[in-house]
Each structure stands twice: as C-alpha cells, then as structure tokens.
Regions:
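Gly/Pro/Ser/Thr-rich low-complexity, intrinsically disordered segments predominantly at protein N-termini
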Residues: 1-213
C-alpha cells in the first residue's frame, strides 16, 4: 500500500487491518495530546489553550488533539452539526472508542496544497481523456458504523457502477503539517473499512514547509 510516496510498513498494515474496534485507538497520549470531555465550557478552555500553543511555535508542533469520553449523545448534540467555531473543527469521530479528533483551523498553505493537488490530478488525467470522469466532492464528513470523518478533499466517478453507493468517495486526500505514522494509519483504516471498500485510494500530502503557516 502506497501513501505519500512511501510504502506503509508491515507494522502499519497490521494496525490498519487489526480486527479490533474503532480506528483512533492507536493515537495514544504519547502520539497526540488527550483531553477528557467535561462539558462545553471546559472543551472551549482546552481548545483555546491548545490553539494558543499551536499558534506560538515551537511550543506545540501538533495540529491535532484527542477528546476522550465523547459518546454518541454528546457528539450528536454538540459536534455533529455546527458549521463554524471550535465545535466544528473535528475531523474524525470514533463511535466505538468514544474518541474525537480535533484539528486546528486549516492554514492558507494547507488550502493551497489541496487546490494544487486537485489541479495536478486533473492535468494527469487529461492525456487519458479522463479529466471529466471524476467529480470533486470536497471535504464534507462521511459517516458509517465506525463513526465519521472528513477528508481534505475527495473525488468519485461521475458515472458510478450499478449498485455503487454515492455515500462514499473513491479517492480521498489527507494533508498534514507533519506526517505522523499513527495518524496516517487511522486515516487509512477508517476510509478503507468504514466505506466497505468503496474508497479505493487514500493519498496523503506532508510538507515541512507548511510549518511556516
């Protein structure tokens, strides 16, 4: 399996293919900071404190943190529908393990990376006369039994095979300020397993230059 120009090693494949519950369990506190959910006000305090560190490097190199103890009721009533603000800045929700992965707002560089990749993809498809075969469906969240997740960008064929659900993309893009192998594994694990095989490719982009934000 290829990701970001490298081959996912055997240990990573074991994580992706592990039959255990959930998909965020490998993001331990030693990998990504964890905060317990203790209500809306405390979440905002934790979010603002993390955001202050994130925006004042080198205090914090991470762009993500995990919120623990987020059951489905808490998720549905607080995080699922908001369109703006801290409560909308989650990128993955693990129903089984009650874990919510929150990401700092996308930087300009981050957005440019997504748009640039989209253009490169279209240019690569044009000689094959497939430039209009794919439609970009953006970064909206996709929900399944495992939880929910939103990519940085996603594509699917304009004409789907008979019986193929429109609920899932065929190709997803994940952009990271820094590549964390455990995060990459959780991304791939969700897309390949939750979609029931409808997602065929997970592409990751990582650039140290993005740290300039």
């Amino acid at each position: 399996m290829a990701a970001n120009g490298t081959i996912v090693n055997g240990g990573a494949e074991n994580t992706i293919n592990d039959p255990g519950r959930g998909f965020l369990g490998n993001l331990t506190p030693s990998v990504i900071p964890h905060y317990a959910y203790r209500g809306r006000e405390q979440f905002l305090c934790d979010y603002n404190a993390f955001s202050e560190q994130f925006n004042n490097p080198p205090n914090c190199a991470d762009q993500w943190f995990i919120v623990t103890g987020v059951n489905k009721r808490i998720f549905d009533s607080n995080f699922r529908d908001p369109e703006t603000g801290p409560f909308s800045n989650w990128c993955s929700y693990d129903t089984a393990l009650e874990l919510l992965l929150v990401r700092m707002p996308r930087s300009t560089t981050h957005s440019i990376a997504s748009r640039t990749f989209h253009q490169v993809l279209l240019e690569a498809l044009e000689p094959l006369r497939m430039g209009r075969a794919l439609t970009c469906i953006g970064g909206g969240s996709h929900f399944g039994d495992m939880g929910g997740k939103g990519p940085d960008d996603a594509w699917r064929p304009i004409q789907l095979p008979p019986g193929r659900s429109r609920a899932w993309p065929a190709v997803v893009l994940e952009v990271a300020l820094s590549e964390i192998q455990a995060k990459l594994c959780s991304d791939v694990r969700y897309w390949l397993r939750a979609s029931g095989g409808d997602v065929k490719s997970v592409i990751t982009l990582s650039s140290a230059a993005m740290h300039a934000r």
